[in-house]
Amino acid sequence: MQLRSSLRLALLALVLLALARPATAVAEDAPFVGWSSLLPGLTLPYDVDSPNDCIAGRVQCVDQVIRQMTMRFKPLASSCDHDAIFALTYLRVTEEYRRTVETPTFFDDTSFVNHEDVLFARYYFAAYDAWAAGRTASVPPAWRVAFDAARDRAVSANGNLLLGINAHVQRDLPFVLYSVGLVRPDGTSRKPDHDRVNQILNRVTDDVIAEVARRFDPTIDDTNLPTTLDDLVLFQTIASWRETAWRHAELLAQAPTPQARDVVAHEIENYAESQARGIRMATQYLPLTGGRAARDAYCATHWAS
């Protein structure tokens, strides 16, 4: 009962965090790093006529991403690594995205969104690979908080999920959006397609939570109320983060100089990290509750179900 109460409080804390003022520095004397100078290494050109499926934004490249996500997820699942929670979630979201684009009219510019989807995944892969290789200086702070919490088995499955989403949406997504561009060649905004992704996220939320509960941690859905209120809170939190990511991408695009863009990038890093630290605090296992051990024991016999 104590664990259930803590998870409910975690959801409340996340709502408050989502309403916090964007891009607030973690500390006045935080070291300055020119993060925007790192962007060229993770860009991907876009050309619909390219023979390269990923550059052209063909759906075959999305299939490649799903295969890579599956390959990465399997060892995390079989070892009951706490990073498996976000890896599974991201895989299921991408699979639903793949099914969605079978309807060619869902997005205004499907090829472009395919291209963005692939680049977005590469940010996650790059962060995880750098962390796994011990190159922590190359890992964005929000991701370090997420990966460290998983390594230390410090937070609930709910915490692992939200730490991963926070790092990928509030940290990575602004840079991805800025990199690919916020407007079409005719000058119209790409935001309608950005917002349509929320429909995909809304469709998969319940099923993902149910699968995590079945395979890894049955307590992740202990907050479920007789209504769908808690699922609505979770989805609206993610939608709010995606809106913040778009606004932060606009700030990157509007920066008048590279130096000004570095300042915006630094604030994005600090904001995502501060959110991550708040999530970790709100979802950490309480001493002597046995939640961590019970979760790992459950996973050991259910991860393949």
Model-derived segments and spans:
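Bacterial N-terminal signal peptides that target proteins for export
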Residues: 1-10
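Hydrophobic helical h-region of N-terminal Sec-dependent signal peptides
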Residues: 11-16
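C-terminal segment of classical bacterial N-terminal signal peptides
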Residues: 17-24
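A cross-kingdom marker for long, charged
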Residues: 28-42, 49, 227-305
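Long acidic/polar interaction regions in large eukaryotic complex-forming proteins
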Residues: 33-35, 40, 90-184
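N-terminal Sec/ER secretory leader and immediately downstream segment
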Residues: 40-115
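Charge-rich, solvent-exposed alpha-helical interaction surfaces
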Residues: 65-68, 72, 89-92, 96, ...
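Short helix-loop boundary/capping segments
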Residues: 170-239
